[in-house]
């Protein structure tokens, strides 16, 4: 059965879009090369879904950025990851921006 574009239904991206700045920052840390960054994300996508970077390297980069191991679950949806980081680091992302 041939499929058409009308058969494709993407999941919502409302929560991810609402946290766009923070989501993009996390993606930039996890995978600095724009060629390997996603062009679209849904609310169901985790950081592990979004970039091809190995988990150990993502963790290392996030630990270096935050200057601590926050014990983050990289398999949860990105928007939930952002909310988790904000609970652990209430001033983020502004408190870690370069001067």
Q: Can you describe what each PLM-predicted range is?
A:
Residues 1-99:
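Phosphopantetheine-dependent thiolation modules in NRPS/PKS and related acyl-activating systems
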């Amino acid at each position: 059965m041939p499929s058409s574009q009308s058969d494709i239904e993407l999941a919502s991206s409302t929560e991810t879009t609402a946290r766009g700045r923070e989501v993009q920052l996390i993606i930039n840390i996890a995978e600095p090369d724009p060629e390997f960054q996603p062009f679209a994300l849904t609310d169901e996508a985790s950081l592990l879904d979004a970039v091809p970077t190995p988990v150990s390297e993502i963790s290392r980069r996030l630990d270096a950025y935050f200057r601590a191991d926050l014990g983050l679950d990289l398999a949860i949806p990105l928007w939930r990851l952002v909310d988790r980081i904000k609970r652990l680091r209430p001033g983020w992302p502004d408190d870690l921006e370069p001067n």
